[in-house]
Amino acid sequence: MNENLFASFAAPTILGLPAAVLIILFPPLLVPTSKHLINNRLITTQQWLIQLTSKQMMTMHSTKGRTWSLMLVSLIIFITTTNLLGLLPHSFTPTTQLSMNLAMAIPLWAGAVVMGFRFKTKNALAHFLPQGTPTPLIPMLVIIETISLLIQPMALAVRLTANITAGHLLMHLIGSATLALSTINLPYALIIFTILILLTILEIAVALIQAYVFTLLVSLYLHDNT
Protein backbone atom coordinates (compact mmCIF):
# COMPACT_ATOMS: atom_id res chain seq x y z
CA MET A 1 0.00 0.00 0.00
CA ASN A 2 1.38 3.41 -0.96
CA GLU A 3 1.70 5.89 1.84
CA ASN A 4 -0.05 9.21 1.43
CA LEU A 5 2.50 11.88 0.49
CA PHE A 6 0.95 14.29 2.95
CA ALA A 7 0.77 11.81 5.84
CA SER A 8 3.95 13.24 7.35
CA PHE A 9 2.31 16.66 7.60
CA ALA A 10 -0.61 15.41 9.72
CA ALA A 11 -0.43 16.44 13.36
CA PRO A 12 0.65 13.42 15.45
CA THR A 13 -1.10 12.32 18.62
CA ILE A 14 0.08 10.63 21.80
CA LEU A 15 -2.59 8.56 23.56
CA GLY A 16 -5.20 10.43 21.56
CA LEU A 17 -3.89 13.85 22.58
CA PRO A 18 -2.28 16.28 20.09
CA ALA A 19 1.50 16.19 20.37
CA ALA A 20 2.01 19.48 18.50
CA VAL A 21 2.27 21.42 21.76
CA LEU A 22 5.09 19.22 23.07
CA ILE A 23 6.87 19.36 19.71
CA ILE A 24 6.63 23.15 19.54
CA LEU A 25 7.99 23.50 23.09
CA PHE A 26 10.90 21.12 22.41
CA PRO A 27 13.24 23.45 20.37
CA PRO A 28 14.19 25.62 23.39
CA LEU A 29 15.79 22.52 24.90
CA LEU A 30 18.26 22.52 21.98
CA VAL A 31 19.52 26.00 22.91
CA PRO A 32 21.13 25.45 26.33
CA THR A 33 22.20 28.23 28.66
CA SER A 34 25.49 28.11 30.53
CA LYS A 35 25.64 28.14 34.35
CA HIS A 36 29.42 28.46 34.45
CA LEU A 37 31.59 31.56 34.49
CA ILE A 38 33.58 30.38 31.44
CA ASN A 39 31.48 29.11 28.54
CA ASN A 40 32.33 26.01 26.53
CA ARG A 41 32.70 26.00 22.75
CA LEU A 42 29.05 25.19 22.09
CA ILE A 43 27.75 28.07 24.20
CA THR A 44 30.38 30.44 22.79
CA THR A 45 29.42 29.55 19.21
CA GLN A 46 25.75 29.91 20.07
CA GLN A 47 26.27 33.37 21.56
CA TRP A 48 28.40 34.45 18.59
CA LEU A 49 25.70 33.42 16.12
CA ILE A 50 23.02 35.20 18.16
CA GLN A 51 25.06 38.39 18.33
CA LEU A 52 25.82 38.23 14.59
CA THR A 53 22.15 37.75 13.72
CA SER A 54 21.03 40.47 16.10
CA LYS A 55 23.54 42.96 14.70
CA GLN A 56 22.53 42.11 11.12
CA MET A 57 18.84 42.78 11.76
CA MET A 58 19.14 45.67 14.21
CA THR A 59 21.54 47.86 12.19
CA MET A 60 18.73 49.66 10.36
CA HIS A 61 16.58 50.19 13.46
CA SER A 62 16.39 53.25 15.65
CA THR A 63 16.98 53.10 19.39
CA LYS A 64 13.28 52.47 19.95
CA GLY A 65 13.17 49.71 17.36
CA ARG A 66 16.12 47.90 18.93
CA THR A 67 13.99 47.05 21.93
CA TRP A 68 12.52 44.31 19.71
CA SER A 69 15.89 42.56 19.29
CA LEU A 70 15.20 39.87 21.90
CA MET A 71 11.88 38.98 20.28
CA LEU A 72 13.42 38.80 16.79
CA VAL A 73 16.34 36.64 17.95
CA SER A 74 13.95 34.32 19.78
CA LEU A 75 11.81 34.10 16.64
CA ILE A 76 14.66 33.14 14.32
CA ILE A 77 16.00 30.57 16.80
CA PHE A 78 12.56 29.01 17.18
CA ILE A 79 11.87 28.79 13.43
CA THR A 80 15.37 27.51 12.67
CA THR A 81 15.30 24.71 15.25
CA THR A 82 11.74 23.76 14.28
CA ASN A 83 12.67 23.55 10.59
CA LEU A 84 15.80 21.51 11.30
CA LEU A 85 13.98 19.09 13.59
CA GLY A 86 11.52 18.44 10.78
CA LEU A 87 14.33 17.03 8.63
CA LEU A 88 14.73 14.08 10.99
CA PRO A 89 13.10 10.86 9.71
CA HIS A 90 9.53 10.20 10.87
CA SER A 91 9.32 13.60 12.54
CA PHE A 92 6.70 16.33 12.37
CA THR A 93 7.44 19.86 11.19
CA PRO A 94 5.08 22.44 12.74
CA THR A 95 6.14 25.06 10.17
CA THR A 96 4.47 23.03 7.41
CA GLN A 97 1.14 23.97 8.99
CA LEU A 98 -0.28 27.20 7.57
CA SER A 99 -2.30 27.74 10.74
CA MET A 100 0.83 27.87 12.89
CA ASN A 101 2.67 30.19 10.52
CA LEU A 102 -0.34 32.50 10.39
CA ALA A 103 -0.44 32.43 14.18
CA MET A 104 3.13 33.75 14.17
CA ALA A 105 2.78 36.19 11.27
CA ILE A 106 -0.52 37.92 12.05
CA PRO A 107 0.24 39.10 15.63
CA LEU A 108 3.72 40.32 14.68
CA TRP A 109 2.43 42.15 11.59
CA ALA A 110 -0.58 43.56 13.43
CA GLY A 111 1.59 44.79 16.29
CA ALA A 112 3.92 46.59 13.88
CA VAL A 113 1.03 48.19 11.98
CA VAL A 114 -0.75 49.31 15.15
CA MET A 115 2.48 50.85 16.42
CA GLY A 116 2.90 52.67 13.13
CA PHE A 117 -0.59 54.16 13.19
CA ARG A 118 -0.22 55.10 16.85
CA PHE A 119 3.24 56.70 16.87
CA LYS A 120 3.76 57.60 13.18
CA THR A 121 0.26 58.30 11.96
CA LYS A 122 1.25 60.63 9.10
CA ASN A 123 3.96 58.32 7.80
CA ALA A 124 1.68 55.29 8.04
CA LEU A 125 -1.07 57.02 6.08
CA ALA A 126 1.45 58.35 3.55
CA HIS A 127 2.29 54.77 2.54
CA PHE A 128 -1.18 54.44 1.04
CA LEU A 129 -0.52 57.22 -1.49
CA PRO A 130 2.93 57.56 -3.10
CA GLN A 131 4.13 61.08 -3.71
CA GLY A 132 3.39 62.54 -7.15
CA THR A 133 0.45 60.23 -7.89
CA PRO A 134 -1.89 61.60 -10.60
CA THR A 135 -5.27 62.62 -9.20
CA PRO A 136 -7.36 60.15 -11.29
CA LEU A 137 -5.27 57.23 -9.96
CA ILE A 138 -5.55 58.13 -6.27
CA PRO A 139 -8.61 55.93 -5.44
CA MET A 140 -7.14 52.93 -7.26
CA LEU A 141 -3.72 53.28 -5.63
CA VAL A 142 -5.23 53.59 -2.16
CA ILE A 143 -7.13 50.34 -2.71
CA ILE A 144 -4.03 48.59 -4.09
CA GLU A 145 -1.82 49.75 -1.22
CA THR A 146 -4.46 48.70 1.32
CA ILE A 147 -4.67 45.22 -0.20
CA SER A 148 -0.87 44.92 -0.31
CA LEU A 149 -0.73 45.85 3.37
CA LEU A 150 -3.38 43.31 4.37
CA ILE A 151 -1.79 40.41 2.49
CA GLN A 152 1.62 40.86 4.13
CA PRO A 153 1.00 38.33 6.94
CA MET A 154 -0.49 35.85 4.47
CA ALA A 155 2.59 36.20 2.25
CA LEU A 156 4.85 35.62 5.26
CA ALA A 157 3.03 32.45 6.29
CA VAL A 158 2.51 31.02 2.80
CA ARG A 159 6.17 31.57 1.83
CA LEU A 160 7.42 29.61 4.84
CA THR A 161 4.79 26.87 4.50
CA ALA A 162 5.30 26.37 0.76
CA ASN A 163 9.09 26.19 0.86
CA ILE A 164 9.26 23.77 3.79
CA THR A 165 6.42 21.58 2.46
CA ALA A 166 7.84 21.39 -1.07
CA GLY A 167 11.24 20.31 0.22
CA HIS A 168 9.76 17.61 2.43
CA LEU A 169 7.63 16.24 -0.42
CA LEU A 170 10.63 16.10 -2.75
CA MET A 171 12.72 14.30 -0.14
CA HIS A 172 9.86 11.84 0.43
CA LEU A 173 9.55 11.09 -3.30
CA ILE A 174 13.29 10.62 -3.83
CA GLY A 175 13.55 8.51 -0.66
CA SER A 176 10.70 6.27 -1.85
CA ALA A 177 12.38 5.91 -5.25
CA THR A 178 15.64 4.91 -3.56
CA LEU A 179 13.93 2.18 -1.55
CA ALA A 180 12.05 0.90 -4.59
CA LEU A 181 15.17 0.72 -6.77
CA SER A 182 17.32 -0.86 -4.05
CA THR A 183 15.76 -4.27 -4.79
CA ILE A 184 15.64 -3.78 -8.57
CA ASN A 185 18.76 -1.93 -9.68
CA LEU A 186 21.34 -1.19 -7.00
CA PRO A 187 23.60 1.15 -9.08
CA TYR A 188 20.66 3.42 -9.92
CA ALA A 189 19.57 3.30 -6.28
CA LEU A 190 23.01 4.50 -5.18
CA ILE A 191 22.86 7.38 -7.67
CA ILE A 192 19.45 8.46 -6.41
CA PHE A 193 20.64 8.06 -2.81
CA THR A 194 23.50 10.45 -3.59
CA ILE A 195 20.94 12.91 -4.96
CA LEU A 196 18.94 12.47 -1.75
CA ILE A 197 21.99 13.37 0.35
CA LEU A 198 22.61 16.49 -1.73
CA LEU A 199 18.94 17.41 -1.45
CA THR A 200 19.10 17.00 2.32
CA ILE A 201 22.02 19.44 2.46
CA LEU A 202 20.01 21.83 0.30
CA GLU A 203 17.00 21.50 2.60
CA ILE A 204 19.16 22.34 5.62
CA ALA A 205 20.16 25.53 3.82
CA VAL A 206 16.51 26.23 2.94
CA ALA A 207 15.49 25.75 6.58
CA LEU A 208 18.07 28.32 7.69
CA ILE A 209 17.31 30.76 4.88
CA GLN A 210 13.54 30.65 5.38
CA ALA A 211 13.91 31.32 9.10
CA TYR A 212 16.14 34.29 8.31
CA VAL A 213 13.79 35.63 5.61
CA PHE A 214 10.73 35.36 7.86
CA THR A 215 12.47 37.18 10.71
CA LEU A 216 14.03 39.78 8.41
CA LEU A 217 10.65 40.68 6.90
CA VAL A 218 9.16 41.07 10.37
CA SER A 219 12.13 43.29 11.21
CA LEU A 220 11.45 45.39 8.09
CA TYR A 221 7.79 45.79 9.09
CA LEU A 222 8.92 46.99 12.51
CA HIS A 223 11.45 49.34 10.91
CA ASP A 224 8.76 50.94 8.75
CA ASN A 225 6.52 51.55 11.76
CA THR A 226 8.92 52.52 14.58
Curated annotation (Swiss-Prot):
Membrane topology type: Multi-pass membrane protein
CDD domains for this protein: ATP-synt_Fo_a_6
GO molecular function, one term: proton-transporting ATP synthase activity, rotational mechanism
Principal localisation: mitochondrion
Membrane found in the keyword field: yes
GO terms under cellular component: mitochondrial inner membrane; proton-transporting ATP synthase complex
Segments crossing the lipid bilayer: 6-26, 68-88, 97-117, 138-158, 164-184, 189-209
Reactions mediated catalytically: H(+)(in) = H(+)(out)
SUPFAM superfamilies: F1F0 ATP synthase subunit A
Its job: Subunit a, of the mitochondrial membrane ATP synthase complex (F(1)F(0) ATP synthase or Complex V) that produces ATP from ADP in the presence of a proton gradient across the membrane which is generated by electron transport complexes of the respiratory chain. ATP synthase complex consist of a soluble F(1) head domain - the catalytic core - and a membrane F(1) domain - the membrane proton channel. These two domains are linked by a central stalk rotating inside the F(1) region and a stationary peripheral stalk.
Family: Belongs to the ATPase A chain family.
Subunit-level organization: Component of the ATP synthase complex composed at least of ATP5F1A/subunit alpha, ATP5F1B/subunit beta, ATP5MC1/subunit c (homooctomer), MT-ATP6/subunit a, MT-ATP8/subunit 8, ATP5ME/subunit e, ATP5MF/subunit f, ATP5MG/subunit g, ATP5MK/subunit k, ATP5MJ/subunit j, ATP5F1C/subunit gamma, ATP5F1D/subunit delta, ATP5F1E/subunit epsilon, ATP5PF/subunit F6, ATP5PB/subunit b, ATP5PD/subunit d, ATP5PO/subunit OSCP.
Protein name in UniProt: ATP synthase F(0) complex subunit a
